[in-house]
UniProtKB/Swiss-Prot annotation:
Cofactor(s), by name: Ca(2+)
Outcome of substituting residue 173 to A: 84% decrease in activity
Residues forming the catalytic site: 287
Outcome, altering residue 77 to Y: 6% increase in activity
Gene3D superfamilies assigned: TolB, C-terminal domain
Reported pH dependence: Optimum pH is 8.0.
Biotechnology: Has potential application in bio-remediation by detoxification of organo-phosphates used in insecticides or nerve agents used in chemical warfare such as soman, tabun and sarin.
Protein name per Swiss-Prot or TrEMBL: Diisopropyl-fluorophosphatase
Species whose genome carries this gene: Loligo vulgaris
GO molecular function annotations of the record: calcium ion binding; diisopropyl-fluorophosphatase activity
Record function comment: Biological function and substrate unknown. However, it is capable of acting on phosphorus anhydride bonds (such as phosphorus-halide and phosphorus-cyanide) in organophosphorus compounds (including nerve gases).
SUPFAM superfamilies for the chain: Calcium-dependent phosphotriesterase
Phenotypic consequence of residue 173 to Y: 53% decrease in activity
Temperature-related activity annotation: Optimum temperature is 35 degrees Celsius.
Amino acid sequence: MEIPVIEPLFTKVTEDIPGAEGPVFDKNGDFYIVAPEVEVNGKPAGEILRIDLKTGKKTVICKPEVNGYGGIPAGCQCDRDANQLFVADMRLGLLVVQTDGTFEEIAKKDSEGRRMQGCNDCAFDYEGNLWITAPAGEVAPADYTRSMQEKFGSIYCFTTDGQMIQVDTAFQFPNGIAVRHMNDGRPYQLIVAETPTKKLWSYDIKGPAKIENKKVWGHIPGTHEGGADGMDFDEDNNLLVANWGSSHIEVFGPDGGQPKMRIRCPFEKPSNLHFKPQTKTIFVTEHENNAVWKFEWQRNGKKQYCETLKFGIF
């Protein structure tokens, strides 16, 4: 059966953001993205930016650097209890970035004493645990490597008690990540994109940093170079997935499998997407024009952790 394709109206918000990624809103409604591909003298010098959505004006708030090593920030989430950003960085691991631009590197090692790997994307569950993909090798000062060919990508959970726990490994470039919740707010399913294989994997969440029953949950269409990147749930638990290199965003029903709908984009390489809180408006980053766009979806987005009051109360 042919998958239906829709073509909503996309509006460009801003452009010229090298490697545009990680769209996120903070609790004040301010919008942030990251520019992972900025370099200085051929070395990583990624940036975290605030975007004025009315004018498109870009303001760099942070250029993370640790011991002379610049960052490659790639994914963002906003905290609930403090208006701060958690940033997955391919060179520096996990960062906490304040809206004034100050930042902290969270962990050099995981709970087992292993050197932390470089991170790409992250998603909070409603209990406040942060689930993270880590497709890079060890953080700086180790040489920069990525798991595009060798399967050394990992998944971490940064728990509410401050532990950085590796929950699985042996992935070929794990990328986008999302958490599905029960109606009462309990997290119960973790979805992880494995870009080169065009697979979406799922796990059952049994508690903080506790997962089991790994299986293929969904398949990304196409034979192009690329695959699943960033993703977000709408309020009906449809999962919208940026299919990098295909000019489409794939829409999966709650049971996964094949997409039930495709959204055609006016650009080839969508990298991530994020709902504006309590609206149908989706902001999309992409790598053809290094730009941010927006369009209207059929439903509101699922509440983010930063929009909840406390666990179980919405």
